[in-house]
Amino acid sequence: MDINQLIEIVKRKINQNISCDTVEVEDKTFLHRSHPSHQNGKFHIKLKIKSLYLKEKNKIESSKKIYKILDEELKKYIHSIQILID
């Protein structure tokens, strides 16, 4: 899977499962290429979500919801994820 496919899947799954105004996904893998733990095919992403639904939850609850939605992608394709809720 390439990063563009992953971004589309992440956006689609978030939008299908959470009421959101916007979902933005940024590839931050380039910042970690020189790290010893870097693996080809594993990506670092930054996820920015504008959602009243998530904003009303605390940080742990909103993160758990996102982790559950992206469970398969986290196991196979995402090495790290930064989540920003607005």
Language model features by range: what are they?
Residues 1-86:
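N-terminal, polar/charged subdomain of small-to-medium soluble alpha/beta proteins
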